[in-house]
Amino acid sequence: MKRIMLFLATNLAVVLVLSVVLNIVYATTGMQPGSLSGLLVMAAVFGFGGALISLMMSKGMALRSVGGMVIESPRNETEHWLLETVGRQAQQAGIGMPTVAIYDSADINAFATGAKRDDSLVAVSTGLLHNMTRDEAEAVLAHEVSHIANGDMVTMTLMQGVVNTFVIFLSRFIANIVASNDDEEGQGTNMMVYFGVSMVLELVFGFLASFITMWYSRHREFHADAGAARLVGKEKMIAALERLKMSQESKLDGTMMAFGINGKQSLTELLMSHPPLDKRIAALRNQ
């Protein structure tokens, strides 16, 4: 219940901040909210603003959502190995030392997040540490470090911002046309039509846009696998992916799943954030 309230409060705060920003833009430019340019600006503020704020808050939100414990001073050999391995890989990849955390989950997974290459987070599940060999775990860590080095978090955020902007703009633009052509029974009826149509269209366009974002997410995974292979060798990366084939489906949600080592299954590959493991293994073998 506490997490739900925190989630709702955070989203409300984001909406309020973006509303203030939007009003400042309208006031300083003299732009009319009801104009086409005003609609586009509103779509961009909420489309990009929400994505960028989520990225800036991603480290703290990710740690809270999984109950992650940051390793500051290693208490045992495993934690010491984690810090040493991530530090070495980060140096090889040319990025700053990420914050390293462990979270309690039987799920064999890890994820990376953060707004900057030199201020990021790598989190590893206890399930991964208990069920993978050191070589396999090293490859998974290299995969996450590669995500950071490739700037995938920022690129994915920018893509999501563009997609959000077009979804909001097209939905409101079409809804305005439909509401204007509706029987003129009063302003209230038209506003109800406007909001009803825009909500439905946002759902439809959002679903269609997910094909684009999921395609890019799968594309990123191949690059992160290749980056990991360069850091630790492709045989270790292949062994890690083979191990994942024996594990359960990922329990991570949202952005954390997108930047995890393993994703969720879907009715169609087009809606998967990660390519099938067999395709990832084949791509590594063909390098």
Curated annotation (Swiss-Prot):
GO terms for cellular component: plasma membrane. Keywords: Cell inner membrane, Cell membrane, Hydrolase, Membrane, Metal-binding, Metalloprotease, Protease, Transmembrane, Transmembrane helix, Zinc. Binds 1 zinc ion per subunit. It comes from the Bacteria. Its cofactor is Zn(2+). It is found in: Cell inner membrane. Pfam families: Peptidase_M48. One of its GO terms (biological process) is proteolysis. It is an enzyme of class 3 (hydrolase). NCBIfam families: PRK05457.1. Its main location: membrane. Its EC number is 3.4.24.-. Zn(2+) binds at H143, H147, E221. The chain crosses the membrane at residues 4-24, 36-56, 158-178, 192-212. InterPro entries: HtpX_protease, Pept_M48_protease_HtpX, Peptidase_M48. The active site is at E144. Belongs to the peptidase M48B family. This is Protease HtpX. One of its GO terms (molecular function) is metalloendopeptidase activity. HAMAP family: Pept_M48_protease_HtpX (MF_00188). It is a multi-pass membrane protein.
